[in-house]
């Protein structure tokens, strides 16, 4: 099996239709806009929610055999009891806090589940803050530098949810064969 590189934007339905004209059997939907700036809220809705809608609907129409949707730990919410560790069954409880990244990743999961109910074979992954070789996000490096100097002033109860890129890649590959459709991990 081969692959073809197609440049486009997930929020542009025409671009997504062009990509799915190739009838891909396996789809990794990893596109998303990570930001906690209020000024990015509208763009996040376009990319994270409408882009996900485009990909899921086109994957269903194309008859894709498996879709792996990269969501985020931010779509899970926060446990009701401080210090409790959340799992994939945690109900989203961050609505109304003005966190558009969290809200849009959760809404994207609702779009994914809607398409699962329509017959799409899709698995969701919820990694934490991804870091590793090739990481271009300076704020991740700043966190580690601060920790190494003893200068990280606050760590939330339950810790910081870091995910090594190698583990995230392994999870995506495992999701192809082992993930249960409609579930998140």
Regions found by a protein language model. Name each.
Residues 96-124:
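Active-site Tyr-X1-5-Lys
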Residues 118-161:
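NAD(P)-dependent short-chain dehydrogenase/reductase
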Residues 12, 26, 51-54, 66, ...:
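Conserved cofactor-binding/catalytic machinery of classical short-chain dehydrogenase/reductase
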Residues 36, 73-83, 130-136:
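Conserved catalytic-site region of short-chain dehydrogenase/reductase
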Residues 3-50, 58:
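NAD(P)H-binding glycine-rich loop region in Rossmannoid oxidoreductase-like domains
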Residues 47-101:
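Conserved Rossmann-fold NAD(P)-dependent oxidoreductase catalytic core, especially the SDR/UDP-sugar
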Residues 144-152, 158-185:
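Alpha-helical substrate-binding/gating segment
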């Amino acid at each position: 099996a081969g692959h073809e590189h197609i440049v486009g934007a997930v929020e542009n339905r025409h671009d997504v239709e062009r990509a799915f004209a190739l009838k891909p059997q396996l789809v990794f939907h990893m596109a998303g806009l990570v930001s906690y700036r209020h000024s990015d809220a509208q763009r996040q809705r376009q990319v994270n929610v409408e882009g996900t809608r485009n990909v899921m609907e086109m994957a269903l129409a194309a008859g894709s055999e498996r879709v792996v949707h990269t969501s985020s730990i931010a779509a899970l919410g926060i446990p009701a009891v401080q210090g409790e560790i959340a799992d994939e069954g945690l109900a989203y409880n961050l609505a109304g806090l003005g966190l558009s990244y969290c809200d849009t990743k959760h809404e994207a999961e609702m779009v994914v589940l809607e398409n699962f109910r329509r017959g799409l074979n899709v698995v969701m992954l919820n990694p934490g803050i991804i870091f590793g070789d090739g990481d271009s996000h300076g704020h991740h490096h700043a966190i580690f530098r601060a920790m190494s100097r003893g200068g990280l002033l606050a760590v939330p109860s339950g810790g910081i949810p870091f995910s090594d890129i190698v583990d995230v890649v392994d999870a995506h590959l495992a999701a192809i064969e082992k993930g249960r459709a409609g579930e998140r991990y």
